[in-house]
Amino acid sequence: MLRFRLILASLLCLCLSGATAAATDIKTTPLYARIKASLDAVPAIDTHDHLRPFAEIPNQDDTDRGRGVTLHSIFAGSYFGGIHRLSPWPAGKSFDEWWKVGSHDFDNARATSSYRYLLPAFRDLYGVDFDTITAEQARDLNDRIFANYKDDKWLNDVVTRRANIELMFIDSYWARLQFARAYQYSVPLLNVTEIMSGTHRSHFSDSDSPYLYAEQRGMKIENLDDYLAVVEKLFVDAVAADAVCLKSTQAYQRTLRYEDVPKPLAQVAFGKPANKLTPEELKDFQDFMFWQVLKLSAKYELPFQIHTGHGRLQGSSPMMLVDAIQANPKTKFILFHGGFPWIGETGAIAMRHRNVWIDSVWLPTLSYTMGKRAYQEWLEVMPADRLMWGADTVQAEGIYAATEFTRQCLAEALAEKVERGELREDHALRIGRQILRDNALKLFPKLKRQLWRKDVPAVTSAQ
């Protein structure tokens, strides 16, 4: 009996010890602090953003003091409005007019990642705890934001110094066929989303039109072969402009299941405006063009960033791309957003196919908990050199917030694995640097000649 009691007491102590350890927030430990400090010191390469030239920063409000960026603008340019109601700014009115209604927009959002990811920006950039903000503090915060956007100094300082970003891929969906660089840290890419739907010139605006692009270069588009020649010329020009990859967001409009459609079926659709196309004809054309783009992606060594998951859930599972991935081993596929919510499936795809990379862009801001779980699961099933990240937003505060949230999420995921004995600390530091910077340099070798920072620290190791 005594022996039984001793064994029972020992088991109880072990259970209590385990419960205490499990209840400890890893972010309060010295281990987490070391890993987070190491990740903070990495000049990151942000593989996806939508930062416009400064004069075109979106979501500005017409206030009683003129047009500018407001506290409302920060939330309007974030993911908050995709999940929660965001009261519009009353045109020409004061901050107080908006705040007396808008302050209640956050009541049911406090636990959501789409709200919480912005808190580090208010805390670190402005010294404000938004969870406990008063009307007076909110008014002052709004005034400071408005003043900061009088010129581009604040924006550039936040991106390069506070967020510690060295290079940023900018998906200029508002001018897809231009490769201008508005900032020292800009990296161009070629967005092929609309090209894959271009059965007729009426499909395009002037800023996106391959038909206008062809005319400006003395090329004609009279049939599908002409169109394909112009598309390939676009790839040639993109490479010459140092574009580093391709991007598609067609999953917002249609399924990711692309069949290898023969050319004659695509020719049926070509030349028809949208109002003359059947849904089947449009899909056939898009499917055909997708496979053409896959071939050009391999030929011109432009890895292909593909939106998967959240946005339009129907048909957006990355599993629908597996046949195309398997049939095009020389094309480098980058599955955006980790396929949220299908993070396990995305990891399995990367595990089985060496031509697949995963970009965690957007994931922590959709669900911090799922983001942390994804990092841990992916690192268990695939090599660490095929994971990346991106901020995916439109102004300084959003960029800082998404960057800080990602560094925190990644540091927490790595620290937990170290604490459980699943990873050495020095290996965790290396993996963190790979995800934030080195993996992009490896996948996109052109980036090396675009680096401009002189103060990049060497790889840190645990002592």
Where are these regions (language model features)?
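Bacterial N-terminal signal peptides
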Residues: I7-S17
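Divalent metal-coordination and catalytic microenvironments
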Residues: H48, M168, L246, H307, ...
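Mid-to-C-terminal alpha-helical segments outside catalytic/metal-binding sites
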Residues: D25-I45, F54, D61, V69-L125, ...
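Boundary at the C-terminal end of the N-terminal hydrophobic targeting segment
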Residues: G18-A23
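Alpha-helical scaffold segments that flank or form the walls of functional sites
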Residues: D40, D61-Y183, S209, L224-D242
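Active-site beta-loop-alpha junctions enriched in small/polar residues
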Residues: H50, Y173, N191-S197, T249-Q253, ...
